[in-house]
Structures are given as structure tokens and as C-alpha cells.
Amino acid sequence: MNQLDALKQVTTVVADTGDFRQLGAYRPQDATTNPSLILKAVQKADYAPLLQESVERWRGRALDEIMDRLIVRFGCEILSLIPGRVSTEVDARLSFDTMATVTRGERIIDLYRAEGVDTARVLIKIAATWEGIEAARILEERGIHTNLTLLFSPVQAVACGAARVQLISPFVGRIYDWYKKQAGAQWDEAAMAGANDPGVQSVRQIYQYYKHFGIRTEVMGASFRNIGQITALAGCDLLTIAPELLAQLAASEAPLERALDPASAKDLELQPVQYDEPGFRYALNADAMATEKLAEGIRAFAADAAKLEQMVLAA
């Protein structure tokens, strides 16, 4: 059995791509997208007709509405190829505006509904800022499920659990990148691999906290740099994986053992944590890595959204 099939026995495998033509080869349950992945897809010749058709169909509408209709179009194409859910992201430029995020999330859901999609199959993806988490709380109360992304810290995870969001996406690779850069020449790749990887350790800590306290929010590890990070999190609720790494897993016959188990978390000695807004902001600020990576991620997604807008305007 290859590692991809073995992983599917203990974890829900999710494809992290806007290039939906790659989905058939790996048969993921769910899929995730973000502005960067959609931009990458529409830059390919295969997707030029989809972009052009979407722009022509909705020409004359506000630019932000055309953008939402375009990403929903990608989501609908993805949903036609998978049995599960797709995550569609709210504009990252709204990451510090709770009610604007709520409004945009509701519009995205309405657009899916207008296309005949069962909206239980859609997760609204939101950056895990304080404002984003509060927006997710409101959306969940209104029956709209959410995926909180750009999550780099247990502080964010605790707040998301308290907000009863459907799913969180703690990042692995970007945490790894930060610690590797900080260490410079002192970084020992072999010593920091697998279970010792700081990104893997972060997801494991969050997973154990949730399972220990019976928090129902799903944990989906994200942002991987190598398959060692993925196999070290086998057993996590979900893992969202880029097609290149899915291909590597499918090509590997190495044994794969379950690394995370909810039952083992019950025996840990953990203390519950709660954050109000000032406490959240202070605790997140105290984590230099999480603060830097959250800000960097929002800037990158916002920049790619702006590039995608320029492609829409030029179409």
C-alpha cells in the first residue's frame, strides 16, 4: 500500500489547489483554495476560458462581486469532482473587519446556493485574527460553517475553539520556515525533522488540546514543505496537501504509522485556557513567529487578490 492510501485510512485527505484538473488522480475527500492558488490556476492557459467566461457573464457588476463569483465558479468545479467540502476564502483585505467578513461570507454562500450547491459542502475560509474569529462565531451561529486559516499559535486555536468554528487550518511549513531562518547556519535539518519539526509540534499541541477538552472543532494541518511533515501528523482529523506532495505520497511504499490519536490526548495533564480580546492580542503579540507569519500571510493573500483583480479587469 502506498503512503497516500495508508494516510487515508487514518486521516481525511484534502487537496490544496485551485487546479481542479489534478483532483482526479488523488481522489481527495475535500479541497481547499485561497487567493494565491486561484491566481496560480488562472495564470494557466487551461483556465483562461473559465476566467473570460466569468468576466463576460458578470461584466458591469462591482469588481468585488465578480471576484466572489469567480472563486465560487472554481469552487463549483471542484465540488463536481470530490465527494466532500470545499473551502472558499473571504478577501484577506477584510481580515480586521468583522462585519464586512460576515457580509462577504454570507454572499459567497448565497452564490453557491444560487448554483444549486448544498451549502453544507462549503466552508468559508477566514484569517484567524481576532476580528476574523468573531466573524466566524457569527457565521456559525447563522448556520454557515467556517475554516479559520493562517493559524500559527495555540492562542488562535483556543479562541477558535471557544467560537465553535467548524475547522481550523494550523500551518506547518510556514512555522518551519520561520524557525529555520532564525537558526541560520545552526539549523540541523535531520535533528529537526518529523516529530521534532516545530510546525509539526505546533499542530500536535493544538490537536492534543482539542481532543483532551472535547473541543469539536476539526483540526486540519496545512502548509507542508515535505512528506515527512505529513507522515508525522498521520491521524490528524484532516491534512490539506498540495498536488506535488500528494504525488510523492502516492509514489512511496514506505510504512506509515499513526502519529496522532485522540484517545492518547485524554491522559495528558493540560489546563484549560480562555482569552478575552485584550488577552488574545497580548498573548499573540508575545509570540513573534505567529505575529510575523499572520501579518505576512494576510499581506501575501491580499497582494494576490489584487493581482487577480487586475486579471479580471484586463479580461
Swiss-Prot record:
Pathway(s): Carbohydrate degradation; pentose phosphate pathway; D-glyceraldehyde 3-phosphate and beta-D-fructose 6-phosphate from D-ribose 5-phosphate and D-xylulose 5-phosphate (non-oxidative stage): step 2/3
GO BP annotations of the record are:
carbohydrate metabolic process; pentose-phosphate shunt
Q: Which Pfam families match?
A: TAL_FSA
Q: Where does the record place the catalytic residues?
A: K125 (schiff-base intermediate with substrate)
A GO CC term attached to the entry = cytoplasm
Tell me where in or outside the cell this protein is found: Cytoplasm
InterPro entries linked to this entry: Aldolase_TIM, TAL/FSA, Transaldolase_1, Transaldolase_AS
**EC number(s) per UniProt?**
2.2.1.2
Q: State where it is primarily located.
A: cytoplasm
Alphabetized, the UniProt keywords read: Cytoplasm, Pentose shunt, Schiff base, Transferase
Q: Quaternary structure?
A: Homodimer.
Record family assignment: Belongs to the transaldolase family. Type 1 subfamily.
Task of the protein: Transaldolase is important for the balance of metabolites in the pentose-phosphate pathway.
Q: What is the protein name stated in its UniProt record?
A: Transaldolase
Species this chain originates from: Paracidovorax citrulli (strain AAC00-1) (Acidovorax citrulli)
